[in-house]
Amino acid sequence: MQIGGMALRDGVLLQSEKYWAAAIREADGSVRVSSGAKAHLPGAETVRQVPLVRGVARLAESLAVLPAVRRATGAPVLPQEDPRMLAATAASAAATLALRSTRRGSPVLKELAVAGVSLAPLLLLLRDSRLARYHGAEHKSIAAYESGREPAEAEKEHARCGSNLIAPIVLTSLGTNLALRALGREREPLATLVAGLVSLGAAMELFSWMARHQDHPLAKTLRLPGIELQRAFTTSEPTPDQLEVADAALSELLRLEEAFPEHARA
């Protein structure tokens, strides 16, 4: 079973294909666990067979869980609800828009600049933060499940972290933007939207290939920027209390998989 997840403001969210489980450290020190079944897009089984579309669909299904997590916890636990995170995201979006609006410079350098400028505020905010430690706890709990090791012994960087999408997205965005320029349609909103969706779909395909071939030299090369970002900015070594929270989320997810095997195979 493949498990994904994300750090919450005071906890961890883990997901399998069919279920989600979140564990939150309450103000009184207790751990609150919430869980449920994931909603799937209509025709999900068919969509999962379509290249370029399937990765985006899986991403959408993962993000669709967040409102349910918010309702279940009854507190502002999502990272996006932190005012500082909102400000950093707004700054990133503004800088990205400004860079993409200019026609000066090499397309390659522009994509690299967009990647750097769009990430910089978020990375500075995350570095050595509580969220980064919970991110590390999330990775360690998943790695421990996959390898059979103790969470404390597992690495805080993980091969399937969304950070590792950076290189695929830069490459696919460069390709679609060059295509738009060649066609003279880089200023058309609809063409830009379609190119963006194609770029994201292609990046997700490449990301999935990297996850299936983790020891391939190309996969290791493409993963390197994301791993280094995890090491330096987006993850920190968690405390034992934070590992306890991540373990609670993992235990609940595994309980659901064991308790409802028919649903898990549906």
Model-predicted regions and their roles:
Residues 1-266:
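Short amphipathic, positively biased membrane-proximal segments
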